[in-house]
């Protein structure tokens, strides 16, 4: 998953991205929703710009669109960092990369980061609770029931993100 650039379906809607720009994809990955393989709903190529008007970098990145909610708008993967020659420093909430007129530094916001982390933790707890309920019944010993539970969970997250 860390090699993917992810864009959440709600973010796509809020950005007003024309649906004709979204291409079909069969990309799947694990690790965002515990115990569930996620299927991307499409992909879109977007221009991403970092810096200031006099010192900036611009690259086109392919984002895979995911059908669930998050406290984030998008996640950049290793390929994005490599394309920009960027180095993230998570403890200081900074991203640095070379620019045409010197180093470009993108600063994070500590307060907003903490709020987002709390929101994401609440979503993870909700998913974990839902999985626990689904897998605690005796019927889940059958493999087809496990597949159904995962599918129901993904559909539930899709429905919630469309309502938001």
Segments predicted by a language model, with ranges:
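Aspartic protease core domain of the pepsin/retropepsin superfamily
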Residues: 3-163
């Amino acid at each position: 998953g860390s090699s993917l650039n992810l864009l959440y379906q709600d973010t796509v809607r809020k950005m007003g991205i024309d649906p004709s720009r979204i291409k079909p994809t069969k990309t799947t990955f694990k690790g965002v929703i515990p115990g569930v393989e996620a299927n991307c709903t499409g992909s879109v190529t977007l221009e991403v710009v970092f810096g200031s008007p006099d010192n900036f970098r611009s690259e086109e990145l392919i984002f895979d669109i995911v059908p669930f909610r998050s406290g984030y708008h998008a996640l950049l993967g290793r390929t994005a960092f490599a394309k920009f020659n960027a180095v993230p420093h998570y403890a200081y909430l900074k991203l640095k990369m070379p620019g045409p007129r010197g180093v470009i530094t993108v600063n994070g916001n500590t307060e907003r980061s903490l709020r987002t982390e709390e929101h994401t933790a609440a979503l993870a707890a909700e998913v974990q609770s839902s999985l626990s309920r689904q897998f605690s019944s005796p019927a889940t010993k059958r493999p087809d029931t496990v597949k159904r539970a995962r599918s129901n969970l993904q559909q539930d997250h899709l429905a919630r993100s469309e309502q938001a």
